[in-house]
Protein backbone atom coordinates (compact mmCIF):
# COMPACT_ATOMS: atom_id res chain seq x y z
CA UNK A 1 0.00 0.00 0.00
CA UNK A 2 1.55 3.31 -1.09
CA UNK A 3 -0.63 5.25 1.37
CA UNK A 4 -0.61 4.37 5.04
CA UNK A 5 -3.54 2.37 6.35
CA UNK A 6 -4.46 5.33 8.55
CA UNK A 7 -4.62 7.62 5.49
CA UNK A 8 -6.75 5.11 3.60
CA UNK A 9 -9.15 4.78 6.54
CA UNK A 10 -9.40 8.56 6.80
CA UNK A 11 -10.13 8.81 3.08
CA UNK A 12 -12.77 6.11 3.42
CA UNK A 13 -14.37 7.84 6.39
CA UNK A 14 -14.61 11.04 4.41
CA UNK A 15 -16.18 9.24 1.44
CA UNK A 16 -18.67 7.44 3.66
CA UNK A 17 -19.64 10.63 5.52
CA UNK A 18 -20.19 12.37 2.18
CA UNK A 19 -22.14 9.37 0.83
CA UNK A 20 -19.69 9.30 -2.06
CA UNK A 21 -20.33 5.85 -3.51
CA UNK A 22 -17.89 6.21 -6.39
CA UNK A 23 -15.08 7.23 -4.04
CA UNK A 24 -15.78 4.20 -1.83
CA UNK A 25 -15.75 2.01 -4.93
CA UNK A 26 -12.52 3.59 -6.19
CA UNK A 27 -10.71 2.98 -2.91
CA UNK A 28 -11.93 -0.62 -2.89
CA UNK A 29 -10.70 -1.09 -6.46
CA UNK A 30 -7.19 0.01 -5.50
CA UNK A 31 -6.54 -2.90 -3.15
CA UNK A 32 -6.64 -6.68 -3.15
CA UNK A 33 -9.10 -8.66 -1.07
CA UNK A 34 -6.56 -9.38 1.73
CA UNK A 35 -5.56 -5.70 1.81
CA UNK A 36 -9.19 -4.57 1.95
CA UNK A 37 -9.71 -6.87 4.92
CA UNK A 38 -6.75 -5.29 6.74
CA UNK A 39 -8.11 -1.83 5.96
CA UNK A 40 -11.54 -2.85 7.30
CA UNK A 41 -9.97 -4.11 10.52
CA UNK A 42 -8.02 -0.88 10.95
CA UNK A 43 -11.13 1.19 10.21
CA UNK A 44 -13.05 -0.55 12.97
CA UNK A 45 -10.17 -0.17 15.42
CA UNK A 46 -9.88 3.55 14.62
CA UNK A 47 -13.54 4.57 14.44
CA UNK A 48 -15.05 1.93 16.74
CA UNK A 49 -17.54 0.77 14.15
CA UNK A 50 -17.25 -1.83 11.38
CA UNK A 51 -16.83 -0.29 7.95
CA UNK A 52 -19.70 -2.43 6.69
CA UNK A 53 -22.03 -0.87 9.27
CA UNK A 54 -20.75 2.61 8.51
CA UNK A 55 -21.53 2.15 4.81
CA UNK A 56 -25.00 0.78 5.59
CA UNK A 57 -25.82 3.75 7.82
CA UNK A 58 -24.58 6.28 5.29
CA UNK A 59 -25.97 5.01 1.99
CA UNK A 60 -29.55 4.62 0.84
CA UNK A 61 -29.84 0.86 0.64
CA UNK A 62 -30.34 -1.26 -2.45
CA UNK A 63 -28.13 -3.63 -4.40
CA UNK A 64 -25.45 -0.98 -4.93
CA UNK A 65 -25.06 -0.57 -1.18
CA UNK A 66 -24.84 -4.34 -0.73
CA UNK A 67 -22.10 -4.49 -3.37
CA UNK A 68 -20.03 -1.80 -1.69
CA UNK A 69 -20.49 -3.40 1.73
CA UNK A 70 -19.41 -6.82 0.49
CA UNK A 71 -16.22 -5.42 -1.00
CA UNK A 72 -14.96 -5.10 2.58
CA UNK A 73 -15.86 -8.60 3.76
CA UNK A 74 -13.56 -11.63 3.73
CA UNK A 75 -14.02 -13.29 0.35
CA UNK A 76 -14.17 -16.71 2.02
CA UNK A 77 -16.91 -15.62 4.41
CA UNK A 78 -18.76 -13.88 1.60
CA UNK A 79 -18.64 -16.91 -0.69
CA UNK A 80 -19.80 -19.15 2.16
CA UNK A 81 -22.75 -16.81 2.79
CA UNK A 82 -23.60 -16.71 -0.91
CA UNK A 83 -23.51 -20.50 -1.14
CA UNK A 84 -25.73 -20.85 1.92
CA UNK A 85 -28.17 -18.34 0.45
CA UNK A 86 -28.16 -20.14 -2.91
CA UNK A 87 -28.97 -23.43 -1.21
CA UNK A 88 -31.83 -22.04 0.86
CA UNK A 89 -35.47 -22.66 0.00
CA UNK A 90 -35.81 -23.07 -3.74
CA UNK A 91 -32.16 -23.49 -4.75
CA UNK A 92 -30.66 -20.77 -6.96
CA UNK A 93 -28.97 -23.07 -9.45
CA UNK A 94 -27.44 -20.27 -11.49
CA UNK A 95 -25.75 -18.91 -8.37
CA UNK A 96 -24.55 -22.37 -7.37
CA UNK A 97 -22.86 -22.85 -10.73
CA UNK A 98 -21.20 -19.43 -10.60
CA UNK A 99 -19.92 -19.96 -7.07
CA UNK A 100 -18.56 -23.44 -7.77
CA UNK A 101 -16.83 -22.74 -11.07
CA UNK A 102 -15.61 -19.22 -10.30
CA UNK A 103 -13.29 -20.44 -7.55
CA UNK A 104 -9.78 -21.85 -7.38
CA UNK A 105 -8.98 -24.92 -5.23
CA UNK A 106 -7.36 -22.93 -2.41
CA UNK A 107 -10.30 -20.54 -2.07
CA UNK A 108 -12.74 -23.46 -2.27
CA UNK A 109 -11.10 -25.24 0.65
CA UNK A 110 -10.94 -22.04 2.70
CA UNK A 111 -14.60 -21.33 1.95
CA UNK A 112 -15.56 -24.88 2.92
CA UNK A 113 -13.79 -24.44 6.25
CA UNK A 114 -15.73 -21.24 6.97
CA UNK A 115 -19.02 -22.75 5.79
CA UNK A 116 -18.63 -25.98 7.77
CA UNK A 117 -17.91 -24.08 10.97
CA UNK A 118 -20.54 -21.36 10.53
CA UNK A 119 -23.43 -23.51 9.35
CA UNK A 120 -22.46 -26.78 11.06
CA UNK A 121 -22.73 -28.89 7.92
CA UNK A 122 -20.41 -30.05 5.17
CA UNK A 123 -20.57 -27.60 2.27
CA UNK A 124 -19.92 -30.13 -0.47
CA UNK A 125 -22.63 -32.44 0.88
CA UNK A 126 -25.06 -29.53 1.15
CA UNK A 127 -24.49 -28.54 -2.48
CA UNK A 128 -24.84 -32.13 -3.70
CA UNK A 129 -28.07 -32.59 -1.74
CA UNK A 130 -29.53 -29.40 -3.21
CA UNK A 131 -28.76 -30.12 -6.87
CA UNK A 132 -29.22 -33.89 -6.93
CA UNK A 133 -27.19 -36.23 -9.09
CA UNK A 134 -29.27 -36.94 -12.18
CA UNK A 135 -28.56 -34.02 -14.51
CA UNK A 136 -25.37 -33.67 -16.53
CA UNK A 137 -24.56 -30.38 -14.83
CA UNK A 138 -25.07 -31.81 -11.33
CA UNK A 139 -22.63 -34.62 -12.11
CA UNK A 140 -20.12 -32.07 -13.37
CA UNK A 141 -20.48 -29.90 -10.26
CA UNK A 142 -20.09 -32.92 -7.97
CA UNK A 143 -16.84 -33.89 -9.67
CA UNK A 144 -15.58 -30.32 -9.87
CA UNK A 145 -15.96 -29.77 -6.13
CA UNK A 146 -13.44 -32.54 -5.49
CA UNK A 147 -10.66 -30.40 -7.02
CA UNK A 148 -8.63 -33.49 -7.85
CA UNK A 149 -6.82 -33.17 -11.17
CA UNK A 150 -3.92 -34.92 -12.84
CA UNK A 151 -2.28 -35.02 -16.26
CA UNK A 152 -4.04 -37.35 -18.64
CA UNK A 153 -0.90 -38.15 -20.63
CA UNK A 154 -1.73 -37.78 -24.32
CA UNK A 155 -3.30 -34.67 -25.78
CA UNK A 156 -4.00 -36.29 -29.16
CA UNK A 157 -5.71 -39.30 -27.59
CA UNK A 158 -7.72 -37.06 -25.28
CA UNK A 159 -8.93 -34.95 -28.19
CA UNK A 160 -10.20 -38.08 -29.93
CA UNK A 161 -11.74 -39.39 -26.70
CA UNK A 162 -13.56 -36.13 -26.01
CA UNK A 163 -14.86 -35.98 -29.58
CA UNK A 164 -16.21 -39.52 -29.19
CA UNK A 165 -17.97 -38.54 -25.96
CA UNK A 166 -19.50 -35.48 -27.59
CA UNK A 167 -20.60 -37.34 -30.73
CA UNK A 168 -22.06 -40.38 -28.94
CA UNK A 169 -25.76 -41.01 -29.70
CA UNK A 170 -26.42 -41.04 -25.95
CA UNK A 171 -24.31 -38.70 -23.85
CA UNK A 172 -22.34 -40.46 -21.12
CA UNK A 173 -22.78 -37.86 -18.40
CA UNK A 174 -20.49 -39.59 -15.93
CA UNK A 175 -17.60 -39.87 -18.38
CA UNK A 176 -18.04 -36.31 -19.65
CA UNK A 177 -18.12 -34.92 -16.12
CA UNK A 178 -15.07 -36.95 -15.14
CA UNK A 179 -13.13 -35.60 -18.12
CA UNK A 180 -13.77 -31.95 -17.27
CA UNK A 181 -13.47 -32.37 -13.50
CA UNK A 182 -10.15 -34.23 -13.55
CA UNK A 183 -8.14 -32.62 -16.37
CA UNK A 184 -5.54 -30.03 -15.39
CA UNK A 185 -5.93 -26.50 -16.79
CA UNK A 186 -2.52 -26.65 -18.50
CA UNK A 187 -3.39 -29.85 -20.34
CA UNK A 188 -6.97 -28.77 -21.06
CA UNK A 189 -5.85 -25.66 -22.92
CA UNK A 190 -3.65 -27.86 -25.11
CA UNK A 191 -6.57 -30.22 -25.69
CA UNK A 192 -8.83 -27.28 -26.53
CA UNK A 193 -6.36 -25.84 -29.04
CA UNK A 194 -5.82 -29.22 -30.70
CA UNK A 195 -9.57 -29.91 -30.75
CA UNK A 196 -10.24 -26.63 -32.53
CA UNK A 197 -7.43 -27.31 -34.98
CA UNK A 198 -8.68 -30.82 -35.76
CA UNK A 199 -12.42 -30.16 -35.99
CA UNK A 200 -12.63 -26.45 -36.81
CA UNK A 201 -14.81 -25.61 -33.81
CA UNK A 202 -14.17 -24.97 -30.13
CA UNK A 203 -15.07 -27.46 -27.42
CA UNK A 204 -17.81 -25.23 -26.03
CA UNK A 205 -19.31 -24.97 -29.52
CA UNK A 206 -19.12 -28.74 -29.99
CA UNK A 207 -20.94 -29.30 -26.70
CA UNK A 208 -24.01 -27.45 -27.94
CA UNK A 209 -25.28 -30.45 -29.91
CA UNK A 210 -25.36 -33.04 -27.09
CA UNK A 211 -26.42 -30.55 -24.39
CA UNK A 212 -28.77 -28.20 -26.22
CA UNK A 213 -31.90 -29.77 -24.72
CA UNK A 214 -31.00 -28.46 -21.26
CA UNK A 215 -29.74 -24.90 -20.89
CA UNK A 216 -28.43 -25.59 -17.38
CA UNK A 217 -26.23 -28.42 -18.68
CA UNK A 218 -24.91 -26.24 -21.48
CA UNK A 219 -24.19 -23.30 -19.16
CA UNK A 220 -22.36 -25.52 -16.68
CA UNK A 221 -20.10 -27.08 -19.29
CA UNK A 222 -19.44 -23.69 -20.87
CA UNK A 223 -18.42 -22.43 -17.43
CA UNK A 224 -16.12 -25.42 -16.94
CA UNK A 225 -14.57 -24.87 -20.36
CA UNK A 226 -13.84 -21.20 -19.68
CA UNK A 227 -12.72 -21.82 -16.09
CA UNK A 228 -10.10 -24.25 -17.35
CA UNK A 229 -8.75 -21.42 -19.50
CA UNK A 230 -8.42 -19.26 -16.36
CA UNK A 231 -10.89 -17.71 -13.92
CA UNK A 232 -10.61 -14.23 -15.51
CA UNK A 233 -11.73 -15.83 -18.79
CA UNK A 234 -14.76 -17.30 -17.04
CA UNK A 235 -15.43 -14.00 -15.27
CA UNK A 236 -15.52 -12.22 -18.64
CA UNK A 237 -17.96 -14.78 -20.03
CA UNK A 238 -20.22 -14.49 -16.96
CA UNK A 239 -20.15 -10.69 -17.04
CA UNK A 240 -21.20 -10.80 -20.67
CA UNK A 241 -23.99 -13.20 -19.73
CA UNK A 242 -25.11 -10.88 -16.90
CA UNK A 243 -25.30 -8.04 -19.44
CA UNK A 244 -27.61 -9.88 -21.83
CA UNK A 245 -30.96 -9.15 -20.12
CA UNK A 246 -32.39 -5.72 -20.92
CA UNK A 247 -31.83 -4.42 -17.40
CA UNK A 248 -28.89 -6.67 -16.58
CA UNK A 249 -28.68 -9.42 -13.97
CA UNK A 250 -27.78 -7.49 -10.82
CA UNK A 251 -27.48 -10.48 -8.51
CA UNK A 252 -25.09 -12.21 -10.87
CA UNK A 253 -22.93 -9.17 -11.63
CA UNK A 254 -22.58 -8.45 -7.91
CA UNK A 255 -21.49 -12.01 -7.16
CA UNK A 256 -18.92 -11.92 -9.94
CA UNK A 257 -17.65 -8.49 -8.93
CA UNK A 258 -17.13 -9.15 -5.23
CA UNK A 259 -15.33 -12.43 -5.94
CA UNK A 260 -13.30 -11.57 -9.05
CA UNK A 261 -12.67 -7.83 -9.25
CA UNK A 262 -9.13 -8.37 -7.90
CA UNK A 263 -8.37 -9.86 -11.32
CA UNK A 264 -10.02 -7.03 -13.24
CA UNK A 265 -7.13 -6.41 -15.63
CA UNK A 266 -7.06 -10.00 -16.90
CA UNK A 267 -10.86 -10.11 -17.04
CA UNK A 268 -10.96 -6.86 -19.04
CA UNK A 269 -8.52 -8.31 -21.53
CA UNK A 270 -10.57 -11.50 -21.85
CA UNK A 271 -13.75 -9.45 -22.29
CA UNK A 272 -12.51 -8.01 -25.57
CA UNK A 273 -13.86 -11.19 -27.15
CA UNK A 274 -17.37 -9.91 -26.40
CA UNK A 275 -16.93 -6.18 -26.92
CA UNK A 276 -16.51 -3.22 -24.57
CA UNK A 277 -17.11 -4.06 -20.92
CA UNK A 278 -17.61 -0.45 -19.87
CA UNK A 279 -20.18 0.19 -22.58
CA UNK A 280 -22.04 -3.02 -21.75
CA UNK A 281 -22.19 -2.21 -18.04
CA UNK A 282 -23.50 1.29 -18.83
CA UNK A 283 -26.10 -0.08 -21.22
CA UNK A 284 -27.45 -2.76 -18.90
CA UNK A 285 -27.38 -1.31 -15.40
CA UNK A 286 -28.99 1.78 -13.92
CA UNK A 287 -27.41 5.17 -13.37
CA UNK A 288 -26.48 4.31 -9.79
CA UNK A 289 -25.09 0.80 -10.29
CA UNK A 290 -23.30 1.22 -13.63
CA UNK A 291 -20.74 3.84 -12.49
CA UNK A 292 -19.93 1.76 -9.40
CA UNK A 293 -19.37 -1.33 -11.52
CA UNK A 294 -17.23 0.57 -14.02
CA UNK A 295 -15.13 1.97 -11.18
CA UNK A 296 -14.59 -1.42 -9.54
CA UNK A 297 -13.70 -3.08 -12.85
CA UNK A 298 -11.59 -0.07 -13.91
CA UNK A 299 -13.37 0.44 -17.19
CA UNK A 300 -14.71 3.65 -18.69
CA UNK A 301 -18.00 4.36 -20.38
CA UNK A 302 -17.83 4.23 -24.17
Swiss-Prot record:
Annexin repeats: 1-72, 74-144, 153-226, 230-298
Subcellular location field: Cytoplasm, Cytoskeleton
InterPro entries (alphabetical): Alpha_giardin (IPR008088), Annexin_repeat (IPR018502), Annexin_sf (IPR037104)
GO cellular component, one term: microtubule
Matches recorded under Pfam families: Annexin, ANXE1_4th
Family indicated by similarity: Belongs to the annexin family. Giardin subunit alpha subfamily.
Function: Giardins are involved in parasite attachment to the intestinal mucosa and in the cytoskeletal disassembly and reassembly that marks the transition from infectious trophozoite to transmissible cyst. They may interact with other cytoskeletal proteins such as microtubules in the microribbons or crossbridges, to maintain the integrity of the ventral disk.
Name recorded for this polypeptide: Giardin subunit alpha-5
Taxonomic lineage: Eukaryota, Metamonada, Diplomonadida, Hexamitidae, Giardiinae
